[in-house]
Amino acid sequence: MIVRVPDYFSEFSCIAGDCKDSCCLGWEIDIDEDSYEYYQTLPGEVGERLRKGMYETEDGGHGIRTNNCGRCIMLNYKNLCDLYIAAGEASLSEVCTDFPRFGIEYRNVEQKCLSLACEEVCRIFFSKTKPVKFVEQELFGDSDDDQGVTEEEAAFFEEVQRELIAICLLYTSPSPRDR
C-alpha cells in the first residue's frame, strides 16, 4: 500500500478557540457507533447534555443536535468543546477527531488530504511560497478497504489528481494574494 500526502499535511494543528470559522457550526455532526455507546455511559452534566442532544439519523446512525444558530450543543462561548474539556481528546467522535483530515483508498493507494473548508488549512496552504508536493510512503500489507471505489472512479480520481498536481506545479506566483 502506498500512502500519499501533501507535503504540508503534518503542519496542521487545530487552532480551536482561535478559529474564526469553527467546524463545530453549520455542519451536520455525525457520531460513530463506538462513540455513541461511550456517550451513553459518560457521567456528569456534560454526559447528560450530550445524551439529550443526540438523535437518530434517517439512515439509522446518530448525530448531535445544533442550537438555533447552528452551533454544536457542546461548543461553548469561547468556541471550545465542552466534551473535549471534560473528557479529553479520546472522547471525541471520529468526525470530530479527523476533520479536516480525510482520505480515500483505491487500488493500492491511500490518499490523505486536508480540507480547505478549514481556516487553518487554508492559512497553511495559501502561505506556501513553493508548489505543493506529494510525499509517498510504501507500507507493507494489503488493504481490504477500497471504500467501494469502482475502477472507473479510481481512474477518474487519479486523472483529476494529476490535473490538480499539474496546476500546483505550474504555479509560480510568489504572492499568496495572487493565487
PLM region spans:
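Intrinsically disordered, low-complexity regulatory regions
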Residues: S143, Q161-A166
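Conserved small/polar residues in nucleotide/adenosyl-binding loops
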Residues: Y171-D178
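Glycine- and acidic
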Residues: D146
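Hydrophobic scaffolds flanking metal-cofactor catalytic centers in soluble metalloenzymes
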Residues: M1-L139, V149, A155-F156, V160
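Hydrophobic, Leu/Ile/Phe/Ala-enriched alpha-helical segments that form helix-helix packing faces
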Residues: P43, L164-Y171
